[in-house]
Amino acid sequence: MLQPKKTKHRKTFRLYHDKRDAHSGNFVAFGDYGLQATGSAWVSAAQIEAARIAITRRMGREGQVIIRVFPHLALTSKPIGVRMGSGKGSVDRWVAVVKRNTILFEVRGVKDEIARDALRLGGHKLPLKWKIVATV
């Protein structure tokens, strides 16, 4: 799964859910079709990987999938049954902070109906609302 190779600090502050629009990464740049977030959420590395697998399996051997988000934020958690205190918990998972209108995945090199169907299948694996956009 996706996670940074090296970070300056092992544990980070927990960011708030930013409900504003994304000002970068909000248009299809590399492919023909894209999966655009219409809401904001934290998307975990496992969810990104599940969506990628669903998209690539639908596309078969043709075409290319571009992942436009990366999980940079480390979320920590304490084990079940441990009392409060005694420091911050260990890193549990990595998440990508996704703002509204961010392009999550792009597809190129396949037919229109296959690309839309593949992105639809991948979008169902994600915890946010989305829409399929195309370059004109």
Curated annotation (Swiss-Prot):
Entries under PROSITE patterns matching the protein: RIBOSOMAL_L16_2
GO molecular function: rRNA binding; structural constituent of ribosome; tRNA binding
CDD domains for this protein: Ribosomal_L16_L10e
Swiss-Prot/TrEMBL keywords: Ribonucleoprotein, Ribosomal protein, RNA-binding, rRNA-binding, tRNA-binding
InterPro entries noted in UniProt: Ribosomal_uL16, Ribosomal_uL16_bact-type, Ribosomal_uL16_CS, Ribosomal_uL16_dom, Ribosomal_uL16_sf
Superkingdom in the source lineage: Bacteria
Spans through the membrane: none
Keyword rRNA-binding: yes
GO biological process, one term: translation
Subunit relationships: Part of the 50S ribosomal subunit.
Family designation: Belongs to the universal ribosomal protein uL16 family.
Function: Binds 23S rRNA and is also seen to make contacts with the A and possibly P site tRNAs.
Record's protein name: Large ribosomal subunit protein uL16
Organism per entry: Mesomycoplasma hyopneumoniae (strain 7448) (Mycoplasma hyopneumoniae)
